[in-house]
């Protein structure tokens, strides 16, 4: 009987500690940057960016995409997908303070946002088959 009571006490103790930890306040993530920044040179957006690539309309799973932009506007991207790897490269042009590229497979438009020292590259695009894509990319190393 003592073993049963001891097990019950440990169970209640573990349940109580778990409840306290689960109810601890969690600091929310700051909202993504919302102030648009005009891209005047490719160096403003150069670097490595990464984030979740979403399709519109949504497919079963979202994919992770990494985009590398060089100082001359050349770019390469790789998306690790559940059905394989999607990759490509090209060169951006600057139009109205935004990054734009068009290839035989589709088009993409990139807009830079900045706020409180944080940056985000919002990318939208579409493939020639009509599939639309969107991603909010953050700088990465």
Model-derived regions: residue spans:
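Bacterial N-terminal signal peptides that target proteins for export
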Residues: 1-12
